[in-house]
Amino acid sequence: MILTLTLNPSVDISYPLTALKLDDVNRVQEVSKTAGGKGLNVTRVLAQVGEPVLASGFIGGELGQFIAKKLDHAGIKHAFYNIKGETRNCIAILHEGQQTEILEQGPEIDNQEAAGFIKHFEQLLEKVEAVAISGSLPKGLNQDYYAQIIERCQNKGVPVILDCSGATLQTVLENPYKPTVIKPNISELYQLLNQPLDESLESLKQAVSQPLFEGIEWIIVSLGAQGAFAKHNHTFYRVNIPKISVLNPVGSGDSTVAGITSAILNHENDHDLLKKANTLGMLNAQEAQTGYVNLNNYDDLFNQIEVLEV
């Protein structure tokens, strides 16, 4: 069983418009409302590829219940921790090939709720074999909250796949308890090191070999349409991917995380892990819906990916 954590989920609302009229009424004919958040995208893709998955995180109020009902409808198991605050909305206005987003900050977690979730998590940890943590921390949690979770996973021997950025990731990296996998994109990688971006192979090798990343088994760096670069222990890989028609790239990173987590759970070899992860990321990009993959195209893309030891 895989446990996914989305500590700051949202109800994602999409409003497609022919044109956005400012200071005027805009009428929308079709509205999409989904259970949102990076970890829930990971959850949906894991369920689609047939992995046993359990979703957790903080939810509150009617919007929190909406998320739970959406997962129920999709047949996805969940064990959320209920809080006093209200789960947030995140609104995307799609207009003239552009996307304007309005993102609520979300609820503030108090000390009692923060401690309560850790106890809740410890109980869930007894019955899972891998944990995928995605996205931002809600307001009120200490910056080292993910580090506390990772410490408990490490003590139980449960691998952790972590997808976050900025100060939250920096805090984890400076902590003695390390995740099994991190998945920064190339910009995030060099921001962590406070270095100018350099896409050359030698620079990437040097970057992921810095002391900041010591103790992390897998570092998988997204290079967008150029594929990926990875380090597994002391081995480096370059992943070349085919050109595809991209319909909606949002959620492709989360789908990649789902592939990594699935491969870790199933003890797949390095080449298959990297190919599965990138295949699912590309499949998501070919769909309008976020966190959705059409597995009919899986084998075709999988077989076109080239993984080279460098």
Curated annotation (Swiss-Prot):
- Pathway stated in the Swiss-Prot or TrEMBL entry: Carbohydrate metabolism; D-tagatose 6-phosphate degradation; D-glyceraldehyde 3-phosphate and glycerone phosphate from D-tagatose 6-phosphate: step 1/2
Alphabetized SUPFAM superfamilies for the sequence: Ribokinase-like (SSF53613)
Enzyme Commission number: 2.7.1.144
Domain of life of the organism encoding this protein: Bacteria
Q: Which InterPro entries match?
A: Carboh/pur_kinase_PfkB_CS, LacC, PfkB_dom, Ribokinase-like, Tagatose/fructose_Pkinase
Q: Which GO terms describe its biological process?
A: D-tagatose 6-phosphate catabolic process; lactose catabolic process via tagatose-6-phosphate
Q: Which GO cellular component terms, listed alphabetically, does the Swiss-Prot or TrEMBL entry include?
A: cytosol
What PROSITE patterns does its record include? PFKB_KINASES_1, PFKB_KINASES_2
Which GO molecular function annotations are given, in alphabetical order? ATP binding; phosphofructokinase activity; tagatose-6-phosphate kinase activity
Enzyme class, UniProt record, top EC level = transferase
Q: Name one Pfam family in it.
A: PfkB
Which reaction does this enzyme catalyse, per its entry? D-tagatofuranose 6-phosphate + ATP = D-tagatofuranose 1,6-bisphosphate + ADP + H(+)
Keyword vocabulary terms for this entry: ATP-binding, Kinase, Lactose metabolism, Nucleotide-binding, Transferase
Family in the record: Belongs to the carbohydrate kinase PfkB family. LacC subfamily.
The record ties this protein, via NCBIfam families, to:
1-PFK (TIGR03168), lacC (TIGR01231), PRK13508.1 (NF010033)
Q: How is this protein named in the record? A: Tagatose-6-phosphate kinase
Which species? Staphylococcus aureus (strain MRSA252)
- Could you tell me the gene encoding this protein? lacC
